[in-house]
C-alpha cells in the first residue's frame, strides 16, 4: 500500500478515472492521491487532443468534478498552484457538490466551488 500517489499521466477523463480508482485501491487509510492539471485556464487548454505545442491540462478537471458530485467518502481540494493540484483523501460524510452538468462553461462559472479550490496558504494549514 501507498501513503501518497501522484497522478500526472494521460490527461483524459476516462484514463484519469481509472488512475484514481486504481490508486484508491492501494492507498493507506490516511494516504493521499495528488492529481496534476486540475484547473485548465481556458477551454482550449482542456481539449481532448493534445496536438503538441504548449501546455495541455486535458480533461482531468472532469474526473475531479465527478467525484465532488458523487463520492462523499473522499475529501477533495484543488490547490490553485501549477495548473491545479488535486488532493484526494479517504474520509467520511463529505459534502457533495449538488449538480450534474459538467461542461466547460459550467466549470468556468462554478470553478471555485465545484473544484473546492484552496490557496497554497490554506493547503499548508489544512494538511499540516
Where are these regions (language model features)?
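A short alpha-helical cap/connector motif
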Residues: 1-6, 10-128
Amino acid at each position: 500500500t501507498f501513503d501518497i500517489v501522484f497522478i500526472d499521466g494521460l490527461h483524459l477523463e476516462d484514463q484519469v478515472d481509472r488512475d484514481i480508482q486504481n490508486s484508491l485501491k492501494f492507498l493507506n487509510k490516511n494516504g493521499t492521491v495528488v492529481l496534476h492539471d486540475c484547473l485548465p485556464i481556458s477551454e482550449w487548454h482542456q481539449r481532448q487532443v493534445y496536438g503538441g505545442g504548449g501546455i495541455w491540462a486535458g480533461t482531468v478537471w472532469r474526473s475531479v468534478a465527478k467525484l465532488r458530485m458523487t463520492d462523499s467518502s473522499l475529501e477533495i481540494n484543488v490547490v490553485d498552484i501549477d495548473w491545479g493540484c488535486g488532493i484526494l483523501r479517504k474520509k467520511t460524510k463529505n459534502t457533495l457538490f449538488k449538480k450534474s452538468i459538467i461542461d466547460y462553461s459550467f466549470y468556468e462559472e462554478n470553478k471555485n466551488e465545484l473544484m473546492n479550490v484552496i490557496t497554497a496558504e490554506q493547503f499548508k494549514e489544512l494538511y499540516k
